[in-house]
C-alpha cells in the first residue's frame, strides 16, 4: 500500500507506475482514492470545527446557568444537541470514507524500482547472471518421478487416494535426502547470522491482507472453514505478521530471520497442478529468509538475499541463474524481484527454484509496523523475503544434476553429514 501523501503530491507517478505494469484497468483507482481522501479530509475538518463550536457553547451554558438565565441556556443546549447529531453523522461518514479509501489503496500497486525491466509477463523477464557450468550428459536423464520411483522414494498413487492430485508420499532415501537439504539450509543460514524460527502455520485474515495482494490471496490461500485462520503459502507470511502493530527501536534493525515451514497453495491459475510430478503441488516444505530493515538499506539486503540462495545452490554443485522480474510479472506489493532458476540437464534449460523480493514499505504500512531512529523519530521499515530452498522442487534439479549413468545419485559433500556420511544412494 503506497503512502497517501505520495498519491496526493504526485498522482501522475502512480498512474505511470500502473501503466508500466500493464494494468490500465486500474487507472480509475487513482481518482477514486483522491476523491475519497478529499471527502475524508473535508469531513475531518468539519468535525473539528463542530467540536470547537460544541466546546465553546458548553462553556457558555455554564456561564448562563450561573447567572440564572435558564431559558437562554436551554436554547444553547438544543444547539449543542444539534451539533452532537451532526458530529455523529460526520464521524460515521469519516469511518465510511476511511474504510473505502483503504479498500481502494490496497488495490493500487507499490511503486516499482526504476531498474525493473519493462515487460508484460514472465516471458519477458531478463537474465542477470549465470553461476556454474550447465551439465550436458552423454546419457539419458529420466523424468524426476521416474528417478524417484527407481530409488523407491515416492508414491504418488497412494497420495492421490488419500488427498487427490498435487500431493505425494516421499519415503526411504528420497525422504531422507529431502530432510537433509532442509537441515543443511537451516544451518547454512544460521552460519550467515540469521535467527532460526519455526513459525505458526496458520494466520488470521488481517495478516493475510497485510502481506499479499487480493489476487495472490485468491490464487494461493486455503481458508479454514468456520475459523478466522488461513494456511500459510510461505513462512514469510507469519514471519512478517510477527511484527504487526509493533514499533521497533533502531538497535533492533535489521531483523534477519530464517524460517522453516510447510507451505500450502491452491495453485489456481494458468499453470495448475501436475498430475504426475512434484514441481507444482499443493503442499511442500521450504526454508525462507526474511529481513526487516531501514529503508536506505533495503536494496543492499536485496542483493545479499538472492546471493545467499545462489551460494547455497553452488555448494551443492547445481548451476543456477538469476532473472530480473519485469514490470508485468511483478506482484502488486513488490518494489523489485528476481527469480533464481536451476539447470535441468534433462530439459536442457533452467527452471524456477526460488524468488527474492524487496517489498519496500508495502507490508509494513499495511500491518502498522513502525520503527524509531536514534533521535526518536518514527519511520516505516522495509521488508524483504527470499527462498533459501524449497524441496521437493529443488530435488528435481539435485537428482538430475547428480544422477550417474548406473542410476545411482551422488550425495554432495555438504549433505553427507545429514545423510549418515553416505556418498551416494541407489
Model-derived regions, located:
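TRNA-recognition modules of translation machinery and tRNA-sensing kinases, especially anticodon-binding
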Residues: 130-426
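N-terminal alpha-helical targeting/anchoring segments
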Residues: 1-134, 149, 153
Amino acid at each position: 500500500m503506497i503512502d497517501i501523501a505520495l498519491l496526493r503530491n504526485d498522482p501522475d507517478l502512480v498512474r505511470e507506475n500502473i501503466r508500466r505494469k500493464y494494468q490500465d484497468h486500474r487507472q480509475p483507482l487513482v481518482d477514486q482514492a483522491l476523491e475519497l481522501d478529499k471527502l475524508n479530509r473535508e469531513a475531518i475538518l468539519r468535525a473539528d470545527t463542530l467540536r470547537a463550536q460544541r466546546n465553546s457553547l458548553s462553556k457558555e451554558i455554564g456561564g448562563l446557568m450561573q447567572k440564572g438565565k435558564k431559558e437562554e441556556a436551554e436554547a444553547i443546549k438544543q444547539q449543542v444537541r444539534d451539533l452532537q447529531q451532526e458530529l455523529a453523522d460526520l464521524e460515521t461518514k469519516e469511518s465510511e470514507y476511511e474504510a473505502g479509501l483503504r479498500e481502494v489503496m490496497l488495490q493500487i500497486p507499490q511503486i516499482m524500482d526504476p531498474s525493473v525491466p519493462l515487460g508484460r509477463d514472465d516471458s519477458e523477464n531478463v537474465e542477470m547472471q549465470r553461476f556454474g557450468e550447465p551439465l550436458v550428459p552423454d546419457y539419458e536423464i529420466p523424468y524426476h518421478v521416474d528417478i524417484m520411483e527407481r530409488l523407491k522414494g515416492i508414491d504418488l498413487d497412494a497420495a492421490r487416494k488419500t488427498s487427490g492430485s498435487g500431493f505425494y508420499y516421499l519415503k526411504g532415501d528420497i525422504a531422507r535426502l529431502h530432510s537433509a537439504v532442509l537441515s543443511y539450509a537451516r544451518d547454512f543460514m544460521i552460519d550467515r547470522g540469521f535467527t532460526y524460527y519455526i513459525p505458526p502455520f496458520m494466520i488470521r485474515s488481517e495478516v493475510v491482507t497485510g502481506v499479499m495482494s487480493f489476487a495472490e490471496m485468491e490464487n494461493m490461500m486455503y481458508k479454514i472453514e468456520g475459523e478466522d485462520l488461513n494456511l500459510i503459502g510461505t513462512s514469510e507470511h507469519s514471519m512478517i505478521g510477527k511484527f504487526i502493530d509493533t514499533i521497533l527501536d533502531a538497535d533492533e534493525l535489521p531483523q534477519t530471520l530464517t524460517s522453516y515451514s510447510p507451505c500450502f497453495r491452491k495453485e489456481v491459475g494458468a499453470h495448475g497442478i501436475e498430475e504426475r510430478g512434484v514441481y507444482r503441488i499443493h503442499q511442500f516444505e521450504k526454508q525462507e529468509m526474511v529481513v526487516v530493515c531501514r529503508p536506505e538499506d533495503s536494496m543492499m539486503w536485496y542483493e545479499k538475499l538472492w546471493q545467499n540462495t545462489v551460494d547455497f545452490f553452488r555448494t551443492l554443485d547445481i548451476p543456477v541463474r538469476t532473472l530480473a522480474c519485469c514490470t508485468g510479472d511483478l506482484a502488486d506489493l513488490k518494489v523489485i524481484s528476481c527469480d533464481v532458476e536451476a539447470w535441468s540437464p534433462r530439459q536442457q534449460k533452467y527452471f524456477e527454484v526460488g524468488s527474492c523480493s524487496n517489498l519496500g514499505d508495502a507490508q509494513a504500512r499495511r500491518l502498522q509496523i513502525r520503527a524509531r531512529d536514534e533521535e526518536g523519530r518514527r519511520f516505516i521499515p522495509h521488508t524483504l523475503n527470499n527462498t533459501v530452498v524449497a524441496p521437493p522442487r529443488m530435488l528435481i534439479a539435485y537428482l538430475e544434476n547428480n544422477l550417474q549413468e548406473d542410476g545411482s545419485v551422488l550425495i554432495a559433500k555438504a549433505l553427507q553429514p545429514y545423510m549418515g556420511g553416505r556418498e551416494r544412494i541407489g
